């Protein structure tokens, strides 16, 4: 990357950065007049009259910030308070719970969780209770049943119907429940219709992506504009990537990244644009053979507009430069592509379809710039603990090489019990792939018939320190025709699976932060590879996690090619055993606004490399601030 390229990229992106605001300025008067009180990104299950169970915390202004909302479709829970008894008035037979005055009548049933009956005199400050009853207009809560809970912790939960809904800013809504203003933001989880967790309100294009900027009440300017930001510092140290004991190689790279985002929303119209800046300074381990390099850039990022409920209810149209993300990042993640994209959702079914290219970013590899992408994703939540997804990716390359993969994938995600989670990704690749024959100079184009899979499970016994244990296996098929002698032409279809080129292969495995689940150091593309992984993790506190992983790498077909890794060394092509790697990942996120991650990797070369090959290591520390 050179500064000249990045400046040119920024200039060429200017029209796209101005596209959303230009359209907004033309449409905003009409949209402002017709803007409904209900936020366009609020989940359709949240309507006036719906019975909800809200878990959260009180704020100094008396409002209730929702962490999680569960929609009770049957509507048979009534009204409930779940929290700590704050005070007791024996003469009036009243309690204070979650700020509510609870009137205990002679016919109120009081019991422990074991169904053992107790009396009013057993109710004392500090006890965690569940109160069932009804709130009267004056605010007093008349108790029908009071149950003393067994485990004591500071619970704050209310249950009742949604009385009203109001928009409070970009990505913000206020629900009225039991007379309390309940604040809903992009960090609020929703569980509805026996489905999985998802954001109760959405602003951007993705759900659950840790790389998204954070929208809160603090970064709102007026009712229709939010200014977001992120600052990230990273230090990476890579040693011995060539596995050569006779040379000192590697580098230390401190880097600083900054992002500023601007989101504006009028009714069903949302426009978003962002600017990015980065600076990297590379220090080689051996100054006698390499020189220091310093690179900085400033460029445009996402710039799109979204029309919700267009062209019909449950549909959204998005046009502009936008990110593509899916939960396991196995097919695609976080590549800004210039796209026309349609989202749809109805009940437990959701889909998206798009056509995209990379029009402006000249710093990308040629594979991205020359491809027209057609992407489709379908998700069906069979029940709360089981989901089925299907993916289709076609990257049409009109150059002479005709590298045009066509990937069809199927995914199953399951969380059948509180102790077990599993996943299974199956993919088939068709299309065409070309390569230049170094002997003849001829471009050889072959059809592709390849396959890949990634299956695994995580077990959580739910005991002290919240340990977890993971086992997984991944396979990307290879092709023995790639090992032919020079000048000999391959025949038949190419059996080598290649990922889309848009993937990042990251996950968290019950951790606070995500990491490269195929290895922090090797971090390979899943092509001509078999990867066996064992992992163990601890979650001693909600904001802290530790993960230890072991990976074993084998080539499906012995080859001298190793795609997209941190290593400079090439395997011999005689032995399939590439080696093994140990990874350690520590994550700490005490607040949504701050995250610290520490990662380390130790790669031990196997029989595919020379006998005197020595290990390679990598260590990374990253601090992130969102505001």
Language model feature labels by segment:
Residues 61, 88, 138, 165, ...:
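Short coil/turn motifs at secondary-structure junctions
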Residues 79, 156, 171, 256, ...:
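Exposed loop/turn and edge beta-strand positions of beta-sandwich/beta-sheet ligand-binding modules
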Residues 292-293, 364-365, 400, 432-445, ...:
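Solvent-exposed loop segments that connect transmembrane elements
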Residues 311-317, 325-486, 539, 550-552, ...:
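Signature for the C-terminal beta-barrel architecture of outer-membrane proteins
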Residues 320:
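Aromatic-lined carbohydrate-recognition surfaces of secreted/lumenal glycan-active proteins
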């Amino acid at each position: 990357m050179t500064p000249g390229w990045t400046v040119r990229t920024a200039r060429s992106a200017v029209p796209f950065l101005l596209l959303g605001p230009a359209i907004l300025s033309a449409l905003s008067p009409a949209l402002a007049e017709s803007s409904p009180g209900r936020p366009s990104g609020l989940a359709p299950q949240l309507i006036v009259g719906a019975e909800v169970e809200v878990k959260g915390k009180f704020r100094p202004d008396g409002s209730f910030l929702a962490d999680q909302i569960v929609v009770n479709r049957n509507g048979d829970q009534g009204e409930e308070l779940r929290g700590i008894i704050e005070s007791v008035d024996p003469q009036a037979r009243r309690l204070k719970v979650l700020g509510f005055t609870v009137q205990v009548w002679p016919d109120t049933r009081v019991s422990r969780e074991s169904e053992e009956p107790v009396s009013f005199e057993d109710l004392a400050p500090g006890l965690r209770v569940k109160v069932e009853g009804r709130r009267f207009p004056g605010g007093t809560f008349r108790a029908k049943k009071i149950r003393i809970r067994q485990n004591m912790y500071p619970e704050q939960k209310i249950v009742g119907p949604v009385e009203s809904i109001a928009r409070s800013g970009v990505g913000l809504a206020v629900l009225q429940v039991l007379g309390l203003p309940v604040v809903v933001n992009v960090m609020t989880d929703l569980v509805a219709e026996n489905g999985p967790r998802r954001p109760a309100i959405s602003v951007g294009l993705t759900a659950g992506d840790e790389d998204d900027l954070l929208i809160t009440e603090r970064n709102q300017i007026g009712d229709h504009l939010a200014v977001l930001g992120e600052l990230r510092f990273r230090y990476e140290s890579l040693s011995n990537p060539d596995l050569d004991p006779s040379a000192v190689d590697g580098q230390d790279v401190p880097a600083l990244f900054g992002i500023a985002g601007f989101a504006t929303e009028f009714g069903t119209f949302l426009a978003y644009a962002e600017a990015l800046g980065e600076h990297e300074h590379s220090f080689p381990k051996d100054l006698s053979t390499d020189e220091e390099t310093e690179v900085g850039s400033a460029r445009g990022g996402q710039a799109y507009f979204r029309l919700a409920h267009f062209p019909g209810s449950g549909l959204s149209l998005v046009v502009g430069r936008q990110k593509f993300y899916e939960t396991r990042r196995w097919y695609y993640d976080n590549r800004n592509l210039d796209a026309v994209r349609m989202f749809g959702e109805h009940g437990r079914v959701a889909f998206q379809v798009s056509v995209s290219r990379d029009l402006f970013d000249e710093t990308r590899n040629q594979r991205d710039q020359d491809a027209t992408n057609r992407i489709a994703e379908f998700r069906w939540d069979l029940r709360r603990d089981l989901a089925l997804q299907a993916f289709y990716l076609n990257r049409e390359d009109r150059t002479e090489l005709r590298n045009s993969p066509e990937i069809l994938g199927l995914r199953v995600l399951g969380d059948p019990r509180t102790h077990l989670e599993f996943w299974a990704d199956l993919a088939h690749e068709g299309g065409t792939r070309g390569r230049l024959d170094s002997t003849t100079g001829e471009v050889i184009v072959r059809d592709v018939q390849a396959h890949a899979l990634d299956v695994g499970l995580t077990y959580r016994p739910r005991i002290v320190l919240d340990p977890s244990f993971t086992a997984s296996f991944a396979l990307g098929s290879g092709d023995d025709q790639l090992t032919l002698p020079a000048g000999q032409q391959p025949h038949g279809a190419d059996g080598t699976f290649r990922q889309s080129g848009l993937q990042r292969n990251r996950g968290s495995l019950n951790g606070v932060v995500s990491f490269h689940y195929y290895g922090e150091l090797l971090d390979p593309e899943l092509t001509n590879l078999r990867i066996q992984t064992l992992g163990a993790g601890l979650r001693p506190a909600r904001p802290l996690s530790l993960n230890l992983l072991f990976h074993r790498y084998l080539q499906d077909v012995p080859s001298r090619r190793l795609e997209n890794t941190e290593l400079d060394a090439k395997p011999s092509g005689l032995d399939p055993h590439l080696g093994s790697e140990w990874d350690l990942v520590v994550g700490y996120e005490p607040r949504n606004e701050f995250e610290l991650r520490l990662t380390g990797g130790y790669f031990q070369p196997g029989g595919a490399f020379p006998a005197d090959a020595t290990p390679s290591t990598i260590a990374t520390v990253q601090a992130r601030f969102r505001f």
